[in-house]
Amino acid sequence: MNDSEFHLLADGLMQALEEALDACQSDADIDCETNGGVMTLSFENGSKIVINRQEPLHQIWLATRAGGYHFDYRNGQWRCSRSGVPLPQVLNEACSAQAGIPVTLDL
């Protein structure tokens, strides 16, 4: 993957995340702020999830209260570089844990 392809994929992911948060039917109050390619999700309890792009590595990084994850684009999906779990699954689990109620983002 070259830098241009990475930018297209990363931009598409960030846009999809914003749309999924807007459409989320959960009772969780999740605020989303994007600044300089970094998306911060803030929860009522003060916890945060940070999603950012690592251009030199062509990765998406996700920082949660439980830990950090690095995602590579493989076979049409962003997948955790360690476990192979798709980003939407990791993000839904992290949002649910931090919100204290089930959260499902339709990505």
Curated annotation (Swiss-Prot):
Transmembrane segments: none annotated. GO terms for biological process: iron-sulfur cluster assembly. It comes from the Bacteria. SUPFAM superfamilies: Frataxin/Nqo15-like. GO terms for cellular component: cytosol. InterPro entries: CyaY, Frataxin/CyaY, Frataxin/CyaY_sf, Frataxin_CS. GO terms for molecular function: ferric iron binding; ferrous iron binding. Keywords: Iron, Metal-binding. PANTHER family: FRATAXIN, FRATAXIN, MITOCHONDRIAL. Involved in iron-sulfur (Fe-S) cluster assembly. May act as a regulator of Fe-S biogenesis. Belongs to the frataxin family. This is Iron-sulfur cluster assembly protein CyaY.
